[in-house]
């Protein structure tokens, strides 16, 4: 069912947003005209945000979602519904899952309604090129009959921040570190309002991975970003007075993983990834009381079949016949 009501960004007041959020929470499609208005509204908010967002505790950190809408609902059930819980999402909202459209629209609506309680930063899948390969573009065309919604959403990707810092102690990013970046100031001066480059510091922040046994920097098997070792993580934390680096980007079967004597934490929030990996997911809960201690996680499983619903079977593409 398509929700047909439409309003411009200036007309999207709290009551309008509440109504749209209620619709979006049911995993119902919102019409293209309304999506355009939502994108315009969230753009007005994101354009004012810095490359590095400053966040206060308490906040709950979420890793990759990848269009698994019903598992996002499970995440909210476990972690608390907005605005009762403050959330920092580390990117990769779309691709691979069945409901990338509904997932990203809901997160944009929540950002519009609660801009100080929802923080969205960019992942490597918030990219025009990547989403044309891994599902988001095709899903938009299938559900809306054209690529216009994809175009509106990918324009918003360019405005997402690149990193966040919690209480001046935790550095949060989608992927990892860059040999080109020693201090936060070097992130602050980047021009982020572009398509994700194939190389360079912005690319590295979204694509890099920690690697045990790596000294300094290594070549990434992903073909973008770098592998970075514990020494690189230690130096970055020392240079910027950080306790820890929090990132997502890698599937972790247990939902989270501690690297380099807890200097780096991976958080993964898509349970049973791609509906077949069998992993659990996690969120990381950060408070003023626990930020200096070991990380605190809530682990959760995929939504049940009853709560998930099944995607409609699509016609088989001709090249498979």
UniProtKB/Swiss-Prot annotation:
Positions bound to Mn(2+) 1: 64, 66, 92
Known EC number: 3.1.3.16
Required cofactor(s): Mn(2+)
Catalytic activity: O-phospho-L-seryl-[protein] + H2O = L-seryl-[protein] + phosphate; O-phospho-L-threonyl-[protein] + H2O = L-threonyl-[protein] + phosphate
Residues engaged in binding Mn(2+) 2: 92, 124, 174, 249
Any one GO biological process: double-strand break repair via homologous recombination
InterPro entries in alphabetical order: Calcineurin-like_PHP_ApaH (IPR004843), Metallo-depent_PP-like (IPR029052), PPA2-like (IPR047129), Ser/Thr-sp_prot-phosphatase (IPR006186)
Cofactor note text: Binds 2 manganese ions per subunit.
GO molecular function list: metal ion binding; protein serine/threonine phosphatase activity
Enzyme class: hydrolase
Domain of life from the UniProt record: Eukaryota
Disulphide connectivity of cysteines: none
GO cellular component, one term: nucleus
Keywords: Hydrolase, Manganese, Metal-binding, Protein phosphatase
Location of the active site: 125 (proton donor)
Purpose: Protein phosphatase which seems to be involved in larval development but not essential for embryogenesis.
Family: Belongs to the PPP phosphatase family. PP-4 (PP-X) subfamily.
Subunit annotation: Serine/threonine-protein phosphatase 4 (PP4) occurs in different assemblies of the catalytic and one or more regulatory subunits.
Stated name of the protein: Serine/threonine-protein phosphatase 4 catalytic subunit 2
Organism classification: Eukaryota, Metazoa, Ecdysozoa, Nematoda, Chromadorea
């Amino acid at each position: 069912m398509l929700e047909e009501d439409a309003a411009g960004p200036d007309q999207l007041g709290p009551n309008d947003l509440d109504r749209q959020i209620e619709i979006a929470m049911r995993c119902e499609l919102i019409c293209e005209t309304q999506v355009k208005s939502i994108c315009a509204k969230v753009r007005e908010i994101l354009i004012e945000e810095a490359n590095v967002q400053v966040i206060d505790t308490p906040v709950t950190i979420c890793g990759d979602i990848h269009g698994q809408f019903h598992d996002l609902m499970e995440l909210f059930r476990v972690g608390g519904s907005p605005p009762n819980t403050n959330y920092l999402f580390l990117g990769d909202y779309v691709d691979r899952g069945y409901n990338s459209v509904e997932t990203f629209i809901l997160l944009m609506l929540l950002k519009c309604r609660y801009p100080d309680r929802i923080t969205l930063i960019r992942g490597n899948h918030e990219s025009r090129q990547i989403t044309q390969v891994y599902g988001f573009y095709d899903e938009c065309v299938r559900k809306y009959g054209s690529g216009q919604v994809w175009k509106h959403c990918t324009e918003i990707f360019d405005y997402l921040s690149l990193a966040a810092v919690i209480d001046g102690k935790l550095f949060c990013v989608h992927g990892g570190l860059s040999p080109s970046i020693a201090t936060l100031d070097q992130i602050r001066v980047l021009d982020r309002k572009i398509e994700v480059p194939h190389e360079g510091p912005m690319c590295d922040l979204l694509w890099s991975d920690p690697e045990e046994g790596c000294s300094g920097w290594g070549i990434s098997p992903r073909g973008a970003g770098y592998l970075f070792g514990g020494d690189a993580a230690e130096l970055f934390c020392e240079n910027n007075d950080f306790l820890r680096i929090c990132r997502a980007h890698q599937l972790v079967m247990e939902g989270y993983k501690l690297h380099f004597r807890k200097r780096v934490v991976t958080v993964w929030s898509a349970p049973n990834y791609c509906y077949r990996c069998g992993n659990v997911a996690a969120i990381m809960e950060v408070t003023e009381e626990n930020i200096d201690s070991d990380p605190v996680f809530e682990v959760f499983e995929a939504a049940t079949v009853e709560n998930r619903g099944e995607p409609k079977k699509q016609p088989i593409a001709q090249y498979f016949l």
